[in-house]
Amino acid sequence: MTYYAINGSPRKTHNTATILNKALEGVKAADPQAQTELIHLYSHDFSGCVSCFECKRLGGKSYGKCAVRDGLTSILERLADADGIIFGSPVYFHSITGKMRMFFERLLFQYFVYDADYSALSPKRMPTAFVYTMNVPYQVMLESHYTESFQSMESFIQRVFSKPETLYVNDTYQFSDYSKYKADR
C-alpha cells in the first residue's frame, strides 16, 4: 500500500508540512508495511492545465492522462497508483495556494468525462483527506464562510477519488519571532 501527502505550501518545514508528516506517521502506525511519501509541490516546476484537451481525445495516446510533460508528470503517474492521498495547503485569501490550484487542475481534469453522468476515468477510487492550515480563529473561519469556499474543490476530488475527510488547523503561527513583524496577535 502506498500513500502520498501533497504539500501545497511553499514552506517545507512549517505548519502544513508538519501536519502532513504527522498524518503519514499515522498511516505508518496503522500499517507498518505502508509506503509513504511527502511531495512538496513548490520543489517542482510545472504549470496548470494548458487546455490542450489531449486527455479528452477519444482514441488518443493521452486519453485520461495529462499530456503536458513537466515537473508534475512523474507525480501524476505515481498518484495514479496510490492507495490514498492526503492534500494539504495553507489558506491564502480564503483559498488554497496557487501552486495547489495548478496541481488540482492537472490531477483532476485529466480524469473528467464530459458526459451526463459526470463520470471519471480515474484508475481507482481511493481514500482522500484535505488539511487546511490558516492563521484564522475557528469561529472567524466559520463566520467568514471559508468552509463553503473549500467545498468546490472537495466536490471535484470526490468525483474523481472519494469524499475527502477534512481537518482545519486554525490559529497557526506565521512567524517564529513575532517581535520582528507588525502583528497584533
Where are these regions (language model features)?
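N-terminal beta1-alpha1-beta2 submodule of the flavodoxin-like/Rossmannoid cofactor-binding fold
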Residues: 1-89, 94-112, 185
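Cofactor-binding loop segments of dinucleotide-utilizing enzymes, especially the Rossmann-like FAD-
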Residues: 8, 41, 133-135, 169
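Flexible, glycine-rich phosphate/dinucleotide-binding loops
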Residues: 12, 45, 137, 173-175
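Glycine-rich phosphate/pyrophosphate-binding loop and the adjoining helix
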Residues: 30, 148-185
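Low-complexity, flexible helical/coil segments
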Residues: 39-42, 71-77, 119-128, 163-170
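A short secondary-structure junction signal
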Residues: 98-99, 139-144, 177-179
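Short, surface-exposed, charged loop/turn segments at secondary-structure junctions
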Residues: 101-107, 143-153, 183
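Short, glycine-/small-residue-rich phosphate/pyrophosphate-handling segment
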Residues: 112-165
